[in-house]
UniProtKB/Swiss-Prot annotation:
Keywords: Chloroplast, mRNA processing, Plastid, RNA-binding, tRNA processing
Cellular component, GO, one term: chloroplast
Organism this protein belongs to: Pistia stratiotes
Lineage top rank: taxon: Eukaryota
Protein name in UniProt: Maturase K
Primary location class: plastid
Compartments (UniProt record): Plastid, Chloroplast
GO BP field: mRNA processing; RNA splicing; tRNA processing
Length: 511
């Protein structure tokens, strides 16, 4: 970060105007390499048949690629695509992914520097900003959901073309060469028929191939989509404060009616009255958001219509109304942050005694519940070959060549991650079933390695060596909350939110 700041200070100009030269700096690719952006190994290793040596990373290939782009202008003006590999030579995926990874690192620099400078100036982040972070979702779930009635489950639509992401990014970064190179990169994949830019799988494929570049482009797009909320909140707040003033201060009632009428004269200001709701809440994580309210079903339908029209008119793409699902909390369960959440109504009767007469009082209570989504998780475990589609554990043959300790460690790490992530669940029965699948799959894998049956293997070694699957989380809880007086098994049934669960992206993204 110090090198980036020094570079921008030498330029003597606005920071985001000079990102393009960073593509030719060695430490950019060393930084991307050290971050381990590719889970299967760094992509910044030059191929032996190209460079003559292995396990080296440099900007030589990037310079060669960019030079070909601008000298030949192959992608834009070429009519004959009979030799699609001509542009990149030996390996088109290697070159293209390499330059895109470097570009993703560079795009993050202005935002990182902005955060660092704000921290240096203010020394402390205001609490109002903290409440808008991802960590504020958990107390919001606990404290607010049980008091609300309606929910809109929203899937933020993707734009029809990647060019729209470039145009939105242009509002943040005014470096023309970098944006032009990004356009060429997208056009390159389009000409080759790469699946990441086909109409149906544009963004899904890009998020899998290059997640860092995907989120660098997608986050400004989401900020743009949500900008309307800030505008409506300010306008609605202004109208609401004016309205309350006219009611409470009766001595100046008629004097304030005139400017109040002028404020609402505009047609759009009148439309805002339809969306005034002091109990409206909006929460988002990545591409999924929820809009909850204590209002009526009519109000939620107006919000839905407004969203669809806003996306179509402002972003020029078709948004299907089915992407916004409206339902009552008591009749609807929704997926968010990897949980299946709901607010069921629990009716109960209380007997009241007054003198010699007694009567029953019907009481309705609502409690926010978070449940482990057992079916999607079993589907994910089935794809990873830990069980079949019915949830029956099977061995993991690809791990049979590892040592016993490595096998147990891998299964234990998966189990601990699941326990850690779903500790906020109000019902742990499904989590116990997932642990059972992993535990028995581990036993089957070890038995397969030693050419034995599971029963004989457990009888010979005992089942204690697998107990860490169930005891690790209890040990952590006993260290965090040592003063709890009631038994630990009751504590483990309590709902506990860990603020670092968003790092386990596979669990938040598989739903």
């Amino acid at each position: 970060m110090e090198e980036f700041k020094g570079y921008f200070e030498k330029s003597g100009s606005i920071q985001q105007h000079f990102l393009y030269p960073l593509l030719f700096q060695e430490y950019i690719y060393a930084l991307a390499h050290n971050h381990g952006l590719n889970v299967n190994g760094s992509i910044f290793y030059e191929l032996p048949e190209i460079s003559g040596y292995d396990k080296k990373f440099s900007s030589l290939l990037v310079k060669r690629l960019i030079t070909r782009v601008y000298q030949q202008n192959y992608l834009i003006n070429s009519v004959n695509h009979s030799n699609p590999n001509r542009f990149v030579g030996h390996n088109k995926n290697f070159y293209s992914q390499m330059i895109s990874e470097g570009f993703a690192v560079i795009v993050e620099i202005p935002f990182s520097l902005r955060l660092v400078s704000s921290l240096e100036e203010k020394k402390e982040i205001p609490k109002s900003q903290n409440l808008r972070s991802i960590h504020s979702i958990f107390p919001f779930f606990e404290d607010n959901f049980s008091h609300l009635n309606w929910i809109s489950d929203i899937l933020i639509p993707y734009p029809d073309h990647l060019e729209m992401l470039v145009q939105i990014l242009q509002c943040w970064i005014q470096d023309v060469p970098s944006l032009h190179l990004l356009r060429i990169f997208f056009h390159e994949y389009h000409n080759w028929g790469n699946p990441i830019t086909s109409r149906k799988s544009n963004y899904y494929g890009l998020s899998k191939e290059n997640p860092r570049l995907f989120w660098s482009l997608y986050n400004p797009y989401v900020v743009k989509c949500e900008s309307i909320f800030n505008f409506l909140r300010k306008q609605s707040s202004y109208l609401r404060s004016t309205f309350y003033g006219t009611i409470l201060e009766r001595t100046h009632f008629y004097g304030k009616m005139k400017p109040f009428g002028v404020t609402c004269a505009n047609d759009f200001q009148k439309t805002l009255w339809l969306f005034k709701d002091p109990f409206m809440h909006y929460v988002r994580y990545q591409g999924k958001s929820i809009l909850v309210s204590k209002g009526t079903h009519l109000l939620m339908k107006k919000w839905k219509s407004y969203f669809v029209n806003f996306w179509q008119c402002h972003f020029r793409f078709w948004s299907q109304p089915g992407r916004i699902h409206i339902s009552q909390f008591s009749k609807f369960s929704f997926y968010f942050l990897g949980y299946l959440s709901s607010v069921p109504i629990n009716p109960s009767a209380v007997k009241s005694q007054m003198l010699e007469s007694s009567f029953l009082i019907d009481i309705v209570t609502k409690k926010f519940e978070t449940i482990v989504p057992i079916i999607p998780i079993i589907g994910s475990l089935s794809k990873a070959k830990f069980c079949n589609v019915s949830g029956n554990p099977i061995s993991k043959p690809v791990w049979a060549d590892l040592s016993d300790s490595d096998i147990i460690d891998r299964f234990g790490r998966i189990c601990r991650n699941l326990s850690h992530y779903y500790s906020g669940s109000s019902k742990k029965k499904s989590l116990y079933r997932i642990k059972y699948i992993l535990r028995l799959s581990c036993a089957r894998t070890l038995a397969r390695k030693h050419k034995s049956t599971v029963r004989a293997f457990l009888q010979r070694l005992g089942s204690e060596f697998l107990e860490e699957f169930f005891t690790e989380e209890e040990k952590v809880l006993s260290l965090i909350l040592p003063r709890i007086s009631y038994p630990l098994h009751k504590l483990y049934r309590e709902r506990i939110w860990y603020l670092d669960i968003i790092r386990i992206n596979n669990l938040t993204n598989h739903l």
